[in-house]
C-alpha cells in the first residue's frame, strides 16, 4: 500500500463510507498485507481474483463486491473505483458504469490513457486528495436525489 492510504481508509470509514477491495491476486497475499499493515477492519468486503475466478477488468469482479455489499444495479451511480491500473481498474469501472478514479501517484503502471475506455473520470495525484474528491462526489449525488 502507498504511504497515506491507511489514513485515507480510516477517514473514509469514520465518515461512514463503505469500502471494498476489488483486486487481482492471491487471497494469501492480501491476508499478509492486511496483517502486516493492520488493515483488516478498513474493508467491508473483498473481491479477489483468486476467489472470483476472473481478473479485472471483468465485470464479475465488481459485481461480486456489489453482491457482497447487497448493492444493486441502480446503486452503481454511487460507487467509485479508485485504481492504479488503466487497463484493469479504469477500464473495468468504465465498462460497468462506475465512476473511475486513477491513482496517479502510482509508479507501477503507465498513467497515460491510450483510448477512451482507459480514460478515468478523475485523477488524484496524492492519496490525501481522495477524501475531498469522494466528499465532493457524494454531495453531487445528494443534490441529484
Stretch-by-stretch model annotation:
Residues 6, 10-13, 17-145:
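Asp-based, Mg2+/Mn2+-dependent phosphohydrolase catalytic module
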Residues 2-3:
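Active-site core of PLP-dependent enzymes with the aminotransferase class I/II
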Amino acid at each position: 500500500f502507498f504511504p497515506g492510504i491507511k489514513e485515507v481508509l480510516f477517514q473514509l470509514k469514520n465518515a461512514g463510507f463503505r469500502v471494498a477491495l476489488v483486486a487481482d491476486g492471491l487471497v494469501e497475499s492480501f491476508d499478509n498485507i492486511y496483517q502486516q499493515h493492520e488493515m483488516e477492519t478498513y474493508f467491508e468486503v473483498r473481491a479477489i481474483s483468486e476467489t472470483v475466478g476472473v481478473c479485472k477488468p471483468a465485470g464479475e469482479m465488481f459485481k461480486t463486491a456489489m453482491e457482497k455489499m447487497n448493492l444493486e444495479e441502480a446503486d452503481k451511480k454511487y460507487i467509485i473505483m479508485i485504481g492504479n491500473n488503466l487497463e484493469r481498474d479504469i477500464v473495468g469501472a468504465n465498462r460497468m458504469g462506475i465512476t473511475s478514479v486513477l491513482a496517479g501517484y502510482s509508479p507501477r503502471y503507465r498513467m497515460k490513457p491510450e483510448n477512451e475506455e482507459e480514460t478515468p473520470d478523475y485523477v488524484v495525484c496524492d492519496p490525501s486528495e481522495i477524501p475531498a474528491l469522494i466528499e465532493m462526489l457524494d454531495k453531487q449525488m445528494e443534490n441529484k436525489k
